Amino acid sequence: MAVMKNYLLPILVLFLAYYYYSTNEEFRPEMLQGKKVIVTGASKGIGREMAYHLSKMGAHVVLTARSEEGLQKVVSRCLELGAASAHYIAGTMEDMTFAEQFIVKAGKLMGGLDMLILNHITQTSLSLFHDDIHSVRRVMEVNFLSYVVMSTAALPMLKQSNGSIAVISSLAGKMTQPMIAPYSASKFALDGFFSTIRTELYITKVNVSITLCVLGLIDTETAMKEISGIINAQASPKEECALEIIKGTALRKSEVYYDKSPLTPILLGNPGRKIMEFFSLRYYNKDMFVSN
């Protein structure tokens, strides 16, 4: 009976809550109406499609990417689609000063922030890893460190709005695959960092959600070009993928899986890890968790 009370019952409650809240909430487009949203990597691919979906829902958007020409076209289309407002600031996420200042400027343009969608990556080629340490450093800085910088800069505004962060990751951040070692390392790092921050926000009663979006192969132009002749797999549509990211983030889900296989969230969702994380909190001195 003691085992049931101390271990099995909490596990049952945890999983019932997890599956109930992850399957029974309904998304409504009006959830995004008037919301102030940042989308990075927004000049093409999934980022561009998210900007278009958000605009149709009546959100304010500030977009960023390296291509000013691409951003101009996307912003123009966003306004046509019904965005409450649409702006862009071009720059590279290799520059951490730009990454931080962009958040500040975007917040001023919109008068606050409700949702931060971190979607950008640096381009890499599929190849076996040998000794290119410079490539590893560059990928980690853009794909991981800039995410940390931007979310840190955005957190004060998100605390005021009880907002949300979407972190765009990949199956490569949940499982190992050949020829993408630096990219995979950056995506595993996102999971480790932002899942920890999610727990800390929960413990300190800060009402900011973090949604880790785990994506399979998506039919973006860049991805299709990179895998040509190397990987033979069917890609999922970027338009639907973008919408699922927005839905999951608006519903404040911890994780969103978007892949061709319905088994992916079951196989990679890692319930054992969630159980371990749940019980590990019992050993902490709760007085140490004081929100600033």
Curated annotation (Swiss-Prot):
Catalytic residue positions: Y183 (proton acceptor)
One GO cellular component term noted in the UniProt record for this chain: endoplasmic reticulum membrane
This protein's record includes keyword Endoplasmic reticulum: yes
Pfam families membership: adh_short (PF00106)
Topological type in the membrane: Single-pass type II membrane protein
Entry-linked PROSITE patterns: ADH_SHORT
Protein name: 11-beta-hydroxysteroid dehydrogenase 1
Organism (species): Mus musculus
Lineage start: Eukaryota, Metazoa, Chordata, Craniata, Vertebrata
